[in-house]
C-alpha cells in the first residue's frame, strides 16, 4: 500500500501563504525532493547534524538564499554549496531577518537529523511554527 507522505506532520506542510514546514526532512534526499517538488526559489532554512550521511558536499540549486543555524552550523557550512549562504546561532536570528521581507517565501527543510539542536523532528517543527507566529502573525 502506498503511503501518502504529504499527510505526515511537518512533511511539506504549508503553514501559511508562502511558508512551508518540512521539519520531517532528516536527510539530503528529502531536502532535495522538497526543493524540486516545489520548484522552490525562496529562502531555505537548514539545520541538524550531517554526520549520519557522511557526504563531503551537497549542492543546493534553486533557493535564493540558504540560512543555516544551530550547533552543527559550521559542519553544514563546510558541506553545503550555494552562492548565498549565511549562518546563525539560532532560528530566532533568521526570523528577525525574514520578518522585514515583504514577500515571505520560506522553506524549512533541515535535511538532517536534529542532532544536538532538538530531541526530534516534531520538537523542531513546533519550534519553527511557534517562531513563525511570534514574528509574522
Language-model segments: residues:
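Glycine/aspartate-rich loop-and-adjacent alpha/beta segment that forms the canonical ThDP
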Residues: 110-137
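Nucleotide phosphate-binding/pyrophosphate-handling subdomain across enzymes
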Residues: 1-64
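C-terminal helical cap/extension that packs against the catalytic core
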Residues: 51-106
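Structural beta-sheet core signal
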Residues: 44-46, 68, 108
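Short glycine-rich anion-binding loops that position phosphate/pyrophosphate groups of nucleotides
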Residues: 26, 49-51, 72, 107-116
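Short, well-ordered alpha-helices that flank and scaffold nucleotide-derived cofactor binding pockets
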Residues: 33-37, 78, 130-134
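Short, glycine/charged-enriched secondary-structure capping and boundary segments
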Residues: 34-35, 58-60, 80-82, 120-124
Amino acid at each position: 500500500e502506498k503511503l501518502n507522505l504529504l499527510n505526515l506532520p511537518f512533511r511539506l506542510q504549508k503553514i501559511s501563504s508562502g511558508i512551508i514546514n518540512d521539519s520531517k526532512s532528516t536527510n539530503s534526499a528529502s531536502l532535495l525532493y522538497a526543493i524540486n517538488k516545489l520548484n522552490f526559489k525562496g529562502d531555505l532554512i537548514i539545520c541538524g547534524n550531517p554526520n549520519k550521511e557522511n557526504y563531503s558536499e551537497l549542492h543546493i540549486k534553486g533557493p535564493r538564499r540558504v540560512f543555516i543555524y544551530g550547533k552543527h552550523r559550521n559542519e553544514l557550512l563546510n558541506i553545503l554549496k550555494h552562492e548565498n549562504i549565511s549562518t546563525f546561532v539560532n532560528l530566532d536570528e533568521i526570523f528577525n531577518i525574514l520578518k522585514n521581507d515583504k514577500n515571505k517565501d520560506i522553506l524549512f527543510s533541515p535535511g538532517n537529523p536534529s542532532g544536538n539542536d532538538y530531541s526530534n523532528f516534531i520538537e523542531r517543527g513546533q519550534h519553527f511554527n511557534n517562531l513563525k507566529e511570534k514574528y509574522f502573525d
